[in-house]
Amino acid sequence: MPSIDGTTGNLPSGRVAIIASRYNANICDSMVQAALQSLSDAGIPEDKQWLIRVPGAWELCWAVEQAFQHADVIGAITLGCVIKGETTHDEHINRAVSDTLMEQAVRSGRPVGFGLLTCNTVEQAIQRSGGAVGNKGHEAADAMLEMLRLQTKMR
């Protein structure tokens, strides 16, 4: 049975929006640098990397919607960090943002790399933004790039 994937192949031309929260800045900044490195490593020139900063995770979806109003934006990478507090605030934010980002990707036909950390502790977030567990900025960017390559092959 023939199969295809997006691990190799050509990328379409266009801009990639990297939309990142300023909240929990040290964690998000590390993920931004990792995502930018992944894009550069994949051959996306710096002038095609559109970095958009938003206040927090809640605003990621709005910025994706605005970025996708530009026809030359071929995909987005969303980066943020929500750390559990004493209330259920984090659960509401995490669910709403996750659901909306998936809906935006499906509706627009453009991939959205999901780099929203949903951690119980600051230490967990640090470990996932360049620590022992890796960097979700790389993972979100690499997933979006793979989906762009797959999309190119499926057309």
Curated annotation (Swiss-Prot):
(2S)-2-hydroxy-3-oxobutyl phosphate binds at residues 86-87, 128. Disulfide bonds: none annotated. Pathway: Cofactor biosynthesis; riboflavin biosynthesis; riboflavin from 2-hydroxy-3-oxobutyl phosphate and 5-amino-6-(D-ribitylamino)uracil: step 1/2. CDD domains: Lumazine_synthase-I (cd09209). Keywords: Riboflavin biosynthesis, Transferase. GO terms for molecular function: 6,7-dimethyl-8-ribityllumazine synthase activity. This is 6,7-dimethyl-8-ribityllumazine synthase. It comes from Rhodopirellula baltica (strain DSM 10527 / NCIMB 13988 / SH1).
